[in-house]
Amino acid sequence: MNDLFKRIFVGAALSFAVVASPATDKKSGEWIQLFNGKNLDGWTPKIRYQELGKDPQKTFRVADGVIKVGYENYDEFKESFGHLFYQSPFSNYRLRVEYRFTGKQLKGGPGWARRNSGLMLHGQDPATMDKDQDFPNSIEVQLLGGFGEGKRTTLNLCTPGTDVEMKGKLLKRHCISSKSKTYHGEQWVTAEVEVRGSKYFKHIIDGKTVLEYQKPQRDDGTLLEGGSISLQSESHPCEFRKVELLPLK
C-alpha cells in the first residue's frame, strides 16, 4: 500500500469515527435486515477498474430471494475483484449472514480464491477507493468452502491494510485460520460476527466462538472504531440469503 493511499485511508477512517455512531443509534435487541430479499436497495457495488456504483457485468444481483454473486457475463476474471457495500457504517454490532458456494470458479480466478468470499468489516468508505484498488482496507472475515475432502476452515481472518492484536501481541500475518469445521458442497452456512468498536471481534459459527482478536487498527497503528460493511466477489459464485445486523450498545 503506497503512502498516498495510506493518507487517503486516514481521512476516510477519521470520517467513519464521526459518522459511524448514528447507524448504531437504533434500539438494541432489534435485528436490522440489511438485505430485504427483493433487490439491492441500500447497497452499492465497487468493482475493480470500474467507477463506484458501476457493475456492467452484473456481478451482484438478486434472484430467488438471494444475493447472487455470479460471473455469467464474464469471459475471464482478470483480477476484477468486487465488493458490495452497505450504505451505512457501523461500530458496535452483531452481524449474521447465511451463505453458500455454488458452481465452479470463473476462468482466470486465482487458485486461492476457489470457494472463497468474505465479509469486509470496519472498512474504508468506498468513495475513497482507487479505481484499480483490489480490496478495501478492512478487517476481512474470510468465508471458505471445502473441496469435498480434507480440512478447510471458514470464518478466518485476513487483514488488507490492517492489523489486529491477539492475546496482547500485534499480528502482522495476513491471514489467520479459525477453529471451525469444514463445510463441503453447496450447503447453507450461518456465520456470525460480534464487533465491539476498537475493542474486539468474535467469529461465531454453530454457536461456538472459533476466532477472536482485539484492537483492529490501520497499518499505522490507529485504532479502527467502525467502518463500512461489504460482501466480496473473488471469482467463485456464491449466494447470500440473509444479511442482518443487531446494533449493540
Question: Model-flagged regions — what are they?
Answer:
Residues 1-12:
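Bacterial N-terminal signal peptides that target proteins for export
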Residues 22-249:
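Carbohydrate-interacting regions of secretory-pathway proteins
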Residues 13-22:
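Hydrophobic h-region of N-terminal signal peptides that target proteins for export
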